[in-house]
Amino acid sequence: MSEQKAFSLKIDEQNIAWLAIDVPNEKMNTLQAAFADEMKEIFAQLKDTSGVKGMVIHSLKPDNFVAGADVRMLEACTTASEAEALAKQGQELFQQLSDLPYPVVAAIHGPCLGGGLELALACDYRVCTDSDKTRLGLPEVQLGLLPGSGGTQRLPRLIGLLPSLDLILTGKQLRAKKAKKLGVVDACVPETVLLDIAKMHVEKGKKKGKQKQSTKEKLMSGSGLGRKFVFEQAAKKTNEKTRGNYPATVAILEVIQHGLEKGFAQGQELEAKRFGELVMSSESKALRSIFFATTEMKKENGAEAEPTAVNKVGVLGGGLMGAGISHVSVAKAKVPVRIKDVSNDGVLNALNYNYKLFEKQRKRRIISKAGLQSKMLQLSGGIDFTSFNHIDVVIEAVFEDLDLKQAMVADIEANAKPETIFATNTSSLPIHKIAEKAERPENIVGLHYFSPVEKMPLVEVIPHETTSEETISTVVALAKKQGKTPIVVKDKAGFYVNRILAPYMNEAAHILLANEPIEQLDGALLDFGFPVGPITLLDEVGVDIGAKIMPILVNELGERFKGPDVFDTLLNDGRKGRKTGKGFYTYKGKKKEVDKSVYKLLNLTPESKLSDNDIALRCVLPMLNEAVRCLDDGIIRSPRDGDIGAIFGIGFPPFLGGPFCYMDQFGLKELVEKMNEFASKYGDRYAPCDGLLTRAGEGRNFYD
C-alpha cells in the first residue's frame, strides 16, 4: 500500500486540474516542510501533462482550507539560517504556483490563515464560502513572526498598502464578506457552489493581470514621498501600542517598504532573512510557547473523569458578571440560559446587556437581525426558580457574601436536579466554606471569571476537597465552549491570579507613597509590557474591591500581603475608581487624566527618582516570588498553567512567556541576586522564597 500523501492531483475530462489538500491523520490542514517534495512532484506532473486549462486548489477537510504552517517545524531550527531556508522553500514553491501558464483558483472553505493564505495569494483567483467558519488572515505577528512565504509582498500588491499594513501588523482575521470587500477574494459564495464557481473562473481561461491601482493608492505606495509618510505614521502608531517590545512589527514595516521600493524579488529575499531572525528571537519563542500551551490545554479535561453534557445553564445574579456569563454561554457555548435575580430590574439589566452586545455584532454584520432575535430567545429570566429543574450547571454571580452564597447553594439543591452542578464565581471566598452546609458538596466548584467576561479569556476552576472529578471535567468543558482557557487551581485564598497580583499591587502602592508620580509608575509597567499600569488597574477593578480582597489574603496567608493602608482614605473621599468617575484618575467618557488632588489627599509631593526599569522590577519581582510559592504549594499544577493564568488573567507580557518562562530567561541565580539587592534596600518582602533559592542553588529551571 502506498503512503498517504497530503496533496493529490487529478485531471478531469475538461483538462482542468484539481489539487486536493488533505493532511493525513490531522483534523486541520497545515503546511509542513516535508510536503515540499510532494509539491515538486505535482509541478513535474503538471509540466508533463499537455493541454491543462487551469487548476483549482481545494481542501478535502470538511471545515478548513489550510490553517497555516505547522508551527512545530520551527522548533527544529537551531539557527536563523535554517529558519530562513524554510521561508525560502515556501517562497519558491508558491512562486512556481504563481508562474503556471494557466489560471489557478483557490477554493476556500473554513480557516485560510498564515501559510494557507500565502498559498491562496499565489493563485490568480480566490473564491471563498460565505460560511461563518471561513476566516482569512496572516496572524504570524501574534507568534512574533512575519509572513515568510511571500505574504508581505503579495498582499500589498493585491489590496493596497494601508489595508495590508492593518492586516499584517495586527494579525486580524477577516470574515468572508469583509475579505471580498477588501479584494482579498474575488467571490464569496454558498458552500454548495464553491467548486462550481472556482471552475467557472478557470474556464475564463485568463490569468489575472496586474491589479490597477487607484489614484489614492498610487499616491500612498507608488510615490516615494507618500510611501515615506505612510510608513512613518504606521511606525509611530505601532510603537505606541507595542512600546518597542515586539520586533516583528518593526521587521514587517521594513520588509514591506523594501519590497515596494526595490521590487518583489528583493522584498522576498529580505522577508526570508527577517523571518529567520525572528524565529530565533526570545519574543517569538515565548509567544510560540503560549501557542503550544493553549493548544495542549484544549485537549485536557482537567480531571480523570469524562465531562457530562451541558444542555442548559442557569445564572444567579443579573449584574455585570452574571450578564457577561450568560452572554458567553449563549453566544459561544450555544446553550440556553435562565437568569435568576432578586428583582425583575436585575433580569432586565442582564437581558439588555446581552442585547447591546448582540446588536454590536449585528451592526458589524457578524450576525443577522434574525440571528440576533434567535440568540435573545435563548435567554430568559425571572425572580424565582422556574425551570431550574431542567438545568445542568448553575453559575452563581451574586455579591461576595458567604451567608448569601450558602443560601444560594441551599436554594439550588432544593429547586434543581440532584446532579446539577453549582459553580460559584467568587473572587475571594473559600469554596469549601461555600460548600460547608451543602447536601451534595461533590457538585460544588469555583468558577472564577474575570471582568469583562465577554473579553477576558481566562477562567479559574477551583475544586474543594470533595468536589467530584466529573464536576471538574464538566465545568472545564463548559468553560472551553464559552471560549475560555480554564486552569484548575487549589482552593486557597486568592486562588492563583489574585494571589500573585496582590504583591504586585502592594509594591506599586509602596512606590507611589514614596512620591513617584502616577504617570511614571503606570508608564514604567506599560513599557515593561503590561496592557495597563498598576494604578490604572486598581481604578479599573475598583478601589473598594481591592479593600475587600487584601484583608482576606493577609488573614489567610500572612503579613507579607499587608500593603500600605490607603484604601480607607481613598474610599472616604469617594474614590472607588472608574465606575464612580474618580479614583487616582478622573474619567470623562473614554478620556482619563491623573487627578492631582489625590497627591494632597495622601500627603504626597510627586517627584521622579527611580528609573523605569527599577519601578517595573520592584513591582514584578514580588509577583514572581509569589508565583513560585503557588507552584510549590500546589495552587497551580504546572509552570505552564501559571504562565497561561498570568498572561490571560492579568496581562503579564505575552512576549516574555509568563512568570515562569520569564524567570528561566532572566536566570534564577541572577533573579535571586536582584531580589536580595532589593531586600537590603526596601525590606524583607523581597526576600526570595525557599523554592526559588533551592532551584537557583541546584541550577534548575522551571522548564527543565
UniProtKB/Swiss-Prot annotation:
GO cellular component terms attached to this protein's record: cytoplasm
Pathway info: Lipid metabolism; fatty acid beta-oxidation
Domain of life: Bacteria
Region (3-hydroxyacyl-CoA dehydrogenase): 308-704
Gene3D superfamilies documented for this protein: 1.10.1040.50, 2-enoyl-CoA Hydratase, Chain A, domain 1, NAD(P)-binding Rossmann-like Domain
Region of interest: Enoyl-CoA hydratase: 1-190
Disulfide bonds: none
CDD domains named among the record's database cross-references: crotonase-like
Site (Important for catalytic activity): E118, E140
Principal localisation: cytoplasm
Keywords, sorted A to Z: Cytoplasm, Fatty acid metabolism, Isomerase, Lipid degradation, Lipid metabolism, Lyase, Multifunctional enzyme, NAD, Oxidoreductase
SUPFAM superfamilies: 6-phosphogluconate dehydrogenase C-terminal domain-like, ClpP/crotonase, NAD(P)-binding Rossmann-fold domains
GO BP term, pick one: fatty acid beta-oxidation
EC number annotated for this UniProt entry: 4.2.1.17, 5.1.2.3, 1.1.1.35
GO molecular function: 3-hydroxybutyryl-CoA epimerase activity; enoyl-CoA hydratase activity; long-chain-3-hydroxyacyl-CoA dehydrogenase activity; NAD+ binding
Catalyses which reaction(s): a (3S)-3-hydroxyacyl-CoA = a (2E)-enoyl-CoA + H2O; a 4-saturated-(3S)-3-hydroxyacyl-CoA = a (3E)-enoyl-CoA + H2O; a (3S)-3-hydroxyacyl-CoA + NAD(+) = a 3-oxoacyl-CoA + NADH + H(+); (3S)-3-hydroxybutanoyl-CoA = (3R)-3-hydroxybutanoyl-CoA
Function: Catalyzes the formation of a hydroxyacyl-CoA by addition of water on enoyl-CoA. Also exhibits 3-hydroxyacyl-CoA epimerase and 3-hydroxyacyl-CoA dehydrogenase activities.
Family: In the N-terminal section; belongs to the enoyl-CoA hydratase/isomerase family. In the central section; belongs to the 3-hydroxyacyl-CoA dehydrogenase family.
Subunit structure as annotated in this protein's UniProt entry: Heterotetramer of two alpha chains (FadJ) and two beta chains (FadI).
HAMAP family reported for this sequence: FadJ
Official protein name in the record: Fatty acid oxidation complex subunit alpha
Organism field: Vibrio campbellii (strain ATCC BAA-1116)
